């Protein structure tokens, strides 16, 4: 029995719950694993750091949701999501950040859509929808 990394709901043999997928897009019925390992994500974050408009200590990537292909894609510009992979020195950082946001929401704070997605090495990557971006694209 699996638990959805977006909603924490039980989801049987599926990777994500229907509710979790609908939080990302009403058009999603499945979501492929992110096409990068945690290590590859950290490398991409290093190479793209000068492009990213959001700074900070944690490695992060800009991404967009491609609903036609049921996957999250790393992009240089126009991303609607920020991805944060597993950290080399601080294990389970994405899980910690997701739980912190969930607790903030439970006490009544407004938080953007967030959760975790599976990567190709079966690690979890934290995602959060950018609240400073508006428009039609996911």
State what each model feature region is.
Residues 39-138:
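Conserved ATP-binding subdomain of kinase catalytic cores across diverse folds
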Residues 1-39:
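Regulatory N- and C-terminal appendages and interdomain linkers associated
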């Amino acid at each position: 029995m699996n638990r959805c990394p977006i909603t924490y709901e039980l989801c049987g043999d599926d990777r994500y719950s229907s509710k979790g997928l609908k939080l990302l897009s009403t058009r999603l019925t499945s979501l492929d694993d992110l096409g990068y390992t945690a290590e590859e994500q950290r490398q991409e974050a290093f190479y793209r750091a000068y492009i990213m408009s959001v700074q900070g200590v944690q490695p992060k990537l800009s991404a967009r949701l491609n609903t036609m292909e049921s996957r999250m894609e790393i992009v240089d510009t126009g991303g609607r999501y920020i991805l944060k992979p597993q950290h080399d020195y601080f294990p389970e950082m994405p899980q910690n950040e997701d739980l912190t946001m969930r607790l903030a929401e439970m006490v009544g704070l407004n938080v953007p859509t967030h959760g975790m997605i599976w990567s190709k090495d079966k690690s979890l990557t934290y995602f959060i929808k950018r609240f400073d971006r508006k428009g039609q694209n996911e």
